[in-house]
Each structure stands twice: as structure tokens, then as C-alpha cells.
Amino acid sequence: MDDETLILLAYIRNAPTREKVLKSFKDEDFLRPIQVSKKTGIHPNNVSKKLKDLREHELVYVINPEYAIPRLYRLTEKGKNMLQFL
């Protein structure tokens, strides 16, 4: 595992909700924030914050940025790679 991956993994694991949100994409092509909330039990407002955070770290991306609701999220290749370590 390279240094960048190790640092990112530590960052993800530092916040249990961040890790739960990322793990919710396992076996899913895409998810809406409300689906992530239902799968994880995390309040929708917190899910939105964590998705924004994961997006800033290039782990997820918005499939349909032109629409505010419902936003559809998908893992990036980097996000898929990180899932194998969680």
C-alpha cells in the first residue's frame, strides 16, 4: 500500500460515519443520500455532509450535478479501491 492510500485510509477510519457512508456503496452502482441514510442509520443531514467530504477527497462523485434533488452518487475508482481496505 502506498503512502497516499495509507493516509487516505487513516482519514476515512478516523470518522466512523465517514467509513459507514463509504461502505454503504458496496454492491451498489449508485445511491441517493436518503438511501445511504437508511442503510447506515445516519441522519440525512450528516449523510450529506459526509458525501460532500468524500466528494472533496475524490472518493465519490455526483452523477447528475445539474439536479439538486435527487442527487445520485457513485464511487470513483479511488473510492472503489479504498473499499477493499475497509
Features from the language model and the residues they span:
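A short, conserved structural fragment
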Residues: 55-65
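Short alpha-helical segments that sit at the start of domains
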Residues: 1-20
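Short acidic, hydrophobic short linear motifs in intrinsically disordered regions
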Residues: 30-38
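Conserved segment of winged-helix/HTH DNA-binding domains
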Residues: 27, 74-86
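Short amphipathic alpha-helical interaction segments
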Residues: 42-56
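Short, Lys/Arg-rich nucleic-acid/phosphate-binding segment
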Residues: 15, 64-72
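Residues within the helices of the helix-turn-helix
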Residues: 23, 33-34, 52
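Pre-recognition alpha-helix immediately N-terminal to the DNA-recognition helix
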Residues: 19-23, 81
